[in-house]
C-alpha cells in the first residue's frame, strides 16, 4: 500500500481527530492578505475565514481534499482546492502572499523529494512572503530513542504513515539552502515550529 492509499484510507477518521486549527497557525494567519497556501492541507484543519485573503489547499490525497471541500461548504468559506504532489505544485511563480506547511513536509518520502517540495514552495511564494513550518522533532522526548529518522507509524488498522524526523539545525538548513531566511523560531518541543521568509 502506497502513502496516497494510506492517507485516503484514514481520511475520514483523521478528519474527526484533527478538528481544531493549531493556535500558532491562527496567530500566524491573523491579518494576512492575498493568496494563502496550505501545503499538505489534509482534511482542512486550518481552513478559516481570513478577511482580505483567500486560502488555497493542496494535498496528494483525493479523499482528504473531498473532506476539505465539504468543510468549506459547511463553514461557507470560499477557497480553492487541488489534488497534487507537493513536489510539483499546480501554481504560477510568485503567486502566494503567505503559506503554512504544517505536519506535511515530514510525510514526504525521500530526501530529494523533500528538498524539491521546499524549492517548489519557494517558487510559488512572492518575494518577502512568509511560511510557517511545523515538523516532528527528532530530539523530542517522544522520538529521542528512535533508532532511525525514518519511521512508519500505524493508524489503527488502516495502514502505516511515513514520517521523517528532523532535528532543528537540519530543517533550518534545508530552508536556507532553498533561499529562505529564518525569521522566527519557537523553542523546539515535540514539533519544530518556525517562520521562514522568501528573500
Task: Give the residues covered by each predicted segment.
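A short glycine-rich, Lys/Arg-flanked "PGG" loop and its adjoining helix->strand segment in the class I
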Residues: 115-127
Amino acid at each position: 500500500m502506497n502513502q496516497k492509499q494510506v492517507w485516503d484510507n484514514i481520511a475520514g477518521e483523521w478528519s474527526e481527530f484533527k478538528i481544531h486549527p493549531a493556535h500558532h497557525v491562527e496567530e500566524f494567519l491573523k491579518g494576512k492578505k492575498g493568496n494563502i497556501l496550505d501545503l499538505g492541507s489534509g482534511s482542512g484543519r486550518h481552513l478559516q475565514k481570513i478577511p482580505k485573503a483567500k486560502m488555497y489547499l493542496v494535498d496528494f490525497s483525493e479523499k482528504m481534499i473531498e473532506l476539505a471541500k465539504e468543510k468549506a461548504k459547511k463553514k461557507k468559506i470560499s477557497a480553492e482546492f487541488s489534488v497534487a504532489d507537493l513536489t510539483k505544485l499546480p501554481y504560477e511563480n510568485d503567486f502566494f502572499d503567505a503559506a503554512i506547511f504544517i505536519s506535511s513536509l515530514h510525510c514526504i518520502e525521500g530526501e530529494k523529494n523533500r528538498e524539491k517540495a521546499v524549492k517548489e514552495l519557494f517558487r510559488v511564494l512572492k518575494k518577502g512572503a512568509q511560511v510557517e513550518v511545523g515538523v516532528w522533532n527528532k530530539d523530542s522526548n517522544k522520538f529521542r530513542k528512535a533508532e532511525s529518522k525514518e519511521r512508519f507509524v500505524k493508524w489503527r488498522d488502516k495502514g502505516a504513515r511515513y514520517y521523517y524526523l528532523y532535528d532543528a539545525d537540519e530543517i533550518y538548513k534545508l530552508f536556507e539552502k532553498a533561499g529562505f531566511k529564518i525569521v522566527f523560531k519557537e523553542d523546539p518541543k515535540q514539533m519544530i515550529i518556525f517562520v521562514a521568509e522568501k528573500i
